[in-house]
């Protein structure tokens, strides 16, 4: 599999894309002694996981979190070095015009017990949730992934949860997790993600989510990653750059997001790609924090475009400069057709119903439109969770569209593809 000395190749393997999948693929290959070149079109590593610093505020490009319960996260990241900052256990639900806290009774017993008295849930729901938690935590992940596949709505109904907790918690929570308020996501994916929620914490690195790919890239040999190299086409054993250059290698891996992989590979892409689900994340600066805790707030009333909200420097003080204002992150489900000004107006109208007239004084800092936030993960999209990564004898593909649409899926996909190359 290694290239012959003096050959015409530029590397043993060329990887297109420096997101999590491409970086873990590169790390696995270089650890096995392969010479790798990673081509990245943008000015930094990370793909969709990037962080901008604006006036001292750290803005992740979209609302993103790390579940420390992800097995691959524990394998690939130095979690201590990331100085993770965690959200409060549980969530706050905007339900029938009031805020109601739903807490994990095993991590926050007092708040968890109070949750049972909330109109969002019942004692029976609490007991069913504990039983489900026990089921997924005491079943190996491979067995959870192999369970019969139904929609998440059918899974929740089959477990006997009440309509109140379905509408008041599961729907807005899954809208925030999968951009899927209709709960059509595969039950296999939902159970695996809930397993990770139950096993760990929901957190962000102190310096922003981009620290995840940066940490991986720092372990690669010097000059492995080449930024600003946009790939226009992928052939058999060669990569054509948009500037007219060509690089060659015995093996080429396309490690981009799904739509870009489909564009580069066309009908060669095994199984194609599922439609994407999108979101818009807006950042505001407020003089007073509307949520004076590290809470994730979800909307169950659906009276406007906001699905979830968090004050990021309540979670991670390092997301704002010292003595800075409250950094409010607001996200939608889907990418609305209206422009940022119209969307901002709708968001403010929605949140004024939550926090009052002070919302009018918030300053909008940024808006990120992310049409390809996640591949859809409905039952028909996932005949198997591990989709084919081999395109042909010289070309491979990896990314969250090959496994689950998550950080876990991207990391697993990159490693799985590298191991397939090494075994070929």
Model-derived segments and spans:
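Conserved flavin/dinucleotide-binding core of flavoenzymes
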Residues: 3-6, 318-424
